[in-house]
From Swiss-Prot:
UniProt entry keywords in alphabetical sequence: Electron transport, Heme, Iron, Membrane, Metal-binding, Mitochondrion, Mitochondrion inner membrane, Respiratory chain, Transmembrane, Transmembrane helix, Transport, Ubiquinone
Organism: Glyptemys muhlenbergii (Bog turtle)
Protein's UniProt name: Cytochrome b
A molecular function (GO) term: ubiquinol-cytochrome-c reductase activity
PANTHER family registered for this protein in UniProt: CYTOCHROME B
Membrane topology: Multi-pass membrane protein
Gene Ontology biological process: mitochondrial electron transport, ubiquinol to cytochrome c
Amino acid sequence: MSTNLRKTHPLVKIINNSFIDLPSPSNISAWWNFGSLLGACLILQTITGIFLAMHYSPDISLAFSSVAHITRDVQYGWLIRNMHANGASLFFMCIYLHIGRGLYYGSYLYKETWNTGITLLLLTMATAFVGYVLPWGQMSFWGATVITNLLSAVPYIGNTLVQWIWGGFSVDNATLTRFFTFHFLLPFTIMGMTMVHLLFLHETGSNNPTGLNSNTDKIPFHPYFSYKDLLGLILMLAFLLTLTLFYPNLLGDPDNFTPANPLSTPPHIKPEWYFLFAYAILRSIPNKLGGVLALLLSILVLFLMPTLHTSKQRTIQFRPLTQTLFWSFIANLMVLTWIGGQPVENPFITIGQVASILHFLILLILMPIAGVIENKMLT
């Protein structure tokens, strides 16, 4: 009798060991669904993105009208465009929930998996930023101007760096064409990095809600988790379609329906909702370089999570002190997101500064201390 092709064929074997016969902990909850949902988001964004690229013109005189042309004249262009725009929001919702799961259950102790994951977050943020510039509306143009301008805070080479990225002395045609190039290229680097992320994950196997070793109790990925993930996928698609078909512009900025005009600055320049927390931290520091560093560190601080883990237990599941801090951290992020969308005036400035300090205080100081206290409570 010949052996199963699924287990012997060099190519199929990889797929089999990753998605079919993969030994998985029997007790992983729905919080472990987000990895596959992110994969689905990436595929969806790539497909809708390629179809949009077929009809888009990366030129400042054509970009805005080519997007209007897609939504008006292309078959189902309105659907493809709205799914792509709202798919990005969904992508970030899943990313943030996925990272939150990792923080809660101590998944960051798989260092390589965690570090590749944070790298994926940074790549996705870069992709979303350059993508937002492409429709060439007011917020596209001014968002690009403000964010690229932050690089001028780099000592000595700052101004040269900004002009090099712009391809001139302001955000212009050269900027748009290169941003289109990056927006097309980066998702493929994300795919490559995702492979590396999974490679490292499958070296150790998944973590589970208890944070204990689950080698004694593994079940095959298929049919158990393939169907469990399918349920998550159906729910996610239902949510995406509801958003796309009923409230397509709910998360967008009305300013982006006005073509880019370098002579008129919008009253409130702000990024999409998924960057607002970082934008609030950037604005909270009354110094350009300081703000840029705080902005970067607010995300890069995640790289330190494995180093800052002081507890004898892996998850926060059974640690009331750290649990309180974790949920305070989440609430604080929501406050930052709200502040990022508000004008720069009191009381928002003060609230933003307090929330920015808390963001770093909780992660870098309070959580490690809580871990030590909880260890003492155990002994």
